[in-house]
Design a protein with these regions (language model features):
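N-terminal signal-anchor transmembrane helix specifying type II single-pass membrane topology
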Residues: 1-23
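N-terminal, immediately post-signal peptide pro-regions of secreted/luminal proteins
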Residues: 20-59
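Short aromatic/hydrophobic-glycine micro-motifs
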Residues: 36, 291, 346-347
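Secretory-pathway glycan-assembly enzymes, especially type II membrane glycosyltransferases
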Residues: 56-317
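Catalytic binding pocket for nucleotide-activated donors in carbohydrate/polymer assembly enzymes
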Residues: 315-432
Length: 434
């Protein structure tokens, strides 16, 4: 952990001493999605990640996944330390179930009564002792578009993912949530009413703490939900595209003419003009100098007549490429696809998030992105914009680092390692009973 420890010391020092506030056609098509759609619901260096080391548990010392740590990991051709720091929160979520007795009957009942929201799957070692494994549907929804790629990927890589399981392992059961929203509110979520005011899609879910039933989901509100996180569908789409082509073309950041922070997108998410997170955020910024924001398509029951002044024409890919700063705002849950498209465009990501996902926690504020507080949008947005304009050189470094970080994430070695560590921790933590 030496690399990230040194980087952490540098990060703390720099924070204390700094005065700053905290193939082309395919690219054109995908970048256009920033303004035409809502969420997906509709690094070149090689590293030598250890595939044999057991996943690490919580420790008192958790280095931060800083830009310096990432760059040093790439230079040293070993990203294990950065991997551990980047995914610390997501993997530590699994440890919350340490010592749980998990009823297989309860898991099957939850899946069966979920109305298609949840499927129960089993990771099973072959009966014949060939050292191979299977990923099999047990109950509930067996097929759903949002998790289809996830299940396909697990089946294709199951032996790599399961290679660190104990010698006597036979089977383990996984509740897989097909929906964007989490399904398992924790016992310590005492402020859900406040969270709902920030984002109406925040809910309790269909699994209660008393069920003692871990749920694997694509998104959650940290501190409120117990869901364990797995990759969202757009990740696999970008992973396939990454394998087919090299880096996508984009105009140099410093040559982009527009310093406004831009957003175009649908009204994805619950709520009306005052409660829908996107509408609420844009209402605060629509007349603010330095922001070029607008809604494009009213969906999910939202009426354009509720806030006609928020609607603007969509932007094409070439329009987005003129901006140095692009905004990401949660949709039904975390805005999965947009964060990857922003990275692909090599713009600075300015995010307004209530939810998180399996990678978002590792994307540190002011290291790889900038963050607007969803509870105080206007004041926070003004502060972020001042920070960006006060140090454009740093902003460019942040944009470039986030682009390289995302390319590092879009690799089989990374997602297989994450799933291997998460599955191994899960099997170690829980005991399945009849």
């Amino acid at each position: 952990m030496r690399v990230c420890f040194v980087s952490l010391c540098f990060y703390i020092f720099s924070r204390k001493t700094s005065s700053k506030v905290s193939s082309r056609d395919a690219f054109e098509k995908r970048l256009s999605e920033l303004g035409n759609r809502g969420d997906a619901r509709e690094a070149d260096d090689e590293d030598n990640l250890s595939h044999s080391a057991a996943p690490k548990r919580k420790s008192a010392h958790n280095p931060a996944p800083t830009r310096a740590c990432f760059e040093e990991s790439m230079r040293s051709n070993s990203s294990t330390d950065f991997f551990d720091a980047f995914f610390h929160k997501a993997l530590a979520d699994v440890d919350e179930f340490q010592g749980f007795n998990v009823s297989k009957a309860t898991l099957a009942s939850i899946a069966s009564r979920s109305g298609g929201k949840i499927g129960l799957y089993a990771l099973q070692k072959h009966a014949i002792d060939d050292g191979k494994f299977g990923w099999n549907h047990v109950a509930g929804a067996s097929e759903f578009w949002s998790t289809r790629d996830f299940h396909t990927y697990i089946r294709e890589h199951v032996n790599e993912i399961a290679k660190n399981l104990p010698e006597d392992f036979k089977e383990a059961y996984f509740l897989i949530n097909n929906y964007d929203e989490p399904q398992s509110m924790g016992v310590h979520c005492v402020d859900i009413d406040r969270l709902r005011k920030l984002h109406p899609n925040v809910g309790e879910g269909i699994v209660s703490p008393g069920d003692q039933a871990p749920v694997w989901s694509m998104s959650k509100v940290r501190g409120c939900h117990m869901d364990i996180l797995f990759p969202f569908p757009d990740y696999f789409s970008h992973l396939r595209e990454r394998k087919r082509s090299r880096d996508t073309p984009a105009s140099p950041w410093s040559e982009r003419p527009n310093d406004d922070i831009a957003f175009r997108g649908s009204t994805t998410g619950f709520g009306d003009a005052t409660s829908n997170l996107r509408a609420r955020a844009l209402s605060a910024l629509i007349d603010e100098p330095g922001f070029d924001v607008g809604l494009t398509v009213p969906i999910q029951g939202f009426q354009k007549s509720w806030a006609p002044h928020l609607f603007k024409n969509t932007m094409k890919a070439e329009d987005f490429r003129k901006f140095k700063f692009l905004m990401d705002i949660d949709g039904n849950a975390h805005s999965f696809n947009r964060q990857l498209l922003i990275a692909q465009s090599k713009a600075v990501m300015v995010r307004v998030n209530v939810f998180t996902d399996w990678i978002a926690d590792g994307v540190m504020d002011e290291e790889f992105c900038y963050t607007i507080d969803p509870s105080d949008v206007l004041r926070s947005a003004r502060a972020v914009r001042r920070t960006l304009l006060d140090d454009l050189e740093r902003a460019e470094h942040v944009a470039n680092a986030y682009h390289r970080l995302t390319r590092w994430l879009l690799r089989d070695e990374i997602v297989v390692r994450y799933l291997r560590d998460a599955f191994t921790r899960y099997v170690s933590s829980v005991r399945f009973v009849e």
